[in-house]
A protein has these predicted regions:
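Short, surface-exposed ligand- or partner-binding patches at beta-edge/loop junctions that are enriched
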Residues: 85
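Rhodanese-like catalytic fold shared by cysteine-dependent sulfurtransferases
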Residues: 2-8, 12-40, 49-81, 90-127
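Structural scaffold elements adjacent to functional motifs in cytosolic proteins
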Residues: 42-44
Length: 127
């Protein structure tokens, strides 16, 4: 019993010492609720062509593959809340990691990207 208690205590201590990245992966329903919150900045990290085909309303385009992504995020407020997405969740996951490495503290990634977003019936806008 003492060994079990010691293991539990050790696990809790280690969990408390782990670094928090600030990133949270959300499904499309949770992501929809997050982007509706006041003050949340929505970032689309797809290409300009993909963005033009349809994007989440209010999203700002910062192309992850442009070669200028790090410079563009350097101009953003690192303490703001960001909801980040792409086509499938791959690029946005990489973008979130890059943002974390740059010191961003409150970043949300949409799992499944606009593919899952559209399949779930959420709207995409063109403008």
């Amino acid at each position: 019993m003492k060994k079990v208690m010691a293991l539990i205590a050790s696990a809790l201590l280690l969990a408390g010492c782990s670094s928090s990245t600030g990133a949270i992966d959300l499904g499309v329903t949770e992501f929809s609720a997050k982007v509706a919150e006041a003050g949340v900045i929505t970032l689309d990290v797809r290409t300009p062509g993909e963005f033009a085909e349809g994007h989440v309303e209010g999203a700002r385009l910062i192309d992850f593959q442009s070669g200028n992504f790090e410079n563009e995020i350097a101009a953003l407020d690192k303490n703001a809340t960001y909801a980040v997405y792409c086509r499938s969740g791959n690029r946005s996951g990489q973008a979130v990691k890059t943002m974390q490495d740059a010191g961003f503290t409150n970043v949300f990634n949409m799992n499944g990207g606009v593919i899952d977003w559209a399949n779930a019936g959420f709207p995409l806008v063109k403008n």
